């Protein structure tokens, strides 16, 4: 069943026994765009990232999700930021999620996660620094090698743009 309103989705009977609904991210990369375009994200980045073996090796990226938790619950302990121990965690189709490392399920609902946007926008974000890393060579190399090219194809134009900027 498709829902127009989030309230109808959350009120569905399939969630009667669920204490939280775990909604996986669907990743979007640069879609081979080098430059910013003044259009909404959903119009600029329409093709999701193919889930590769490299992405699957990174459990935090592979199983990233947001949770909707039922109110009035006590003693919820988040072993993983979006999966709660000793609670009934469900997927958007109402099936119980046994393990937070289960493959993502995008069949009923997902959250679009625009990881890098265009190459230009990624560089702009890099230049701002990061809350976890001070702005240094390690940070730049990590973000470009271990993050940007995890989601995007390596192409000469992108490499030149990343090196020059």
Predicted regions and their residues:
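Catalytic-site signature of metal-activated, phosphate-bearing donor transferases
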Residues: 1-165
């Amino acid at each position: 069943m498709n829902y127009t309103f989030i309230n109808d989705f959350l009120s569905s009977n399939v969630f009667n026994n669920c204490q939280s609904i775990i909604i996986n991210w669907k990743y979007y990369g640069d879609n081979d765009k080098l430059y910013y375009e003044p259009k909404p994200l959903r119009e600029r980045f329409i093709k999701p990232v193919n889930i590769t073996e490299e992405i699957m090796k990174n459990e935090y990226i592979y199983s990233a999700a947001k949770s909707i938790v039922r109110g009035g619950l006590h003693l919820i302990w988040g072993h993983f930021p979006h999966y709660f121990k000793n609670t009934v965690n469900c997927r958007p189709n109402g099936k119980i999620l046994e393990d937070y490392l289960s493959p993502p399920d995008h069949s009923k609902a997902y959250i679009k996660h625009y990881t890098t946007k265009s190459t230009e926008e990624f560089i702009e974000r890099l230049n701002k620094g990061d809350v976890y890393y001070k702005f240094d060579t390690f940070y730049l190399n990590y973000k470009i090698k271990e993050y940007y090219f995890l989601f995007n194809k390596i192409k000469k134009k992108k490499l030149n743009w990343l090196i020059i900027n």
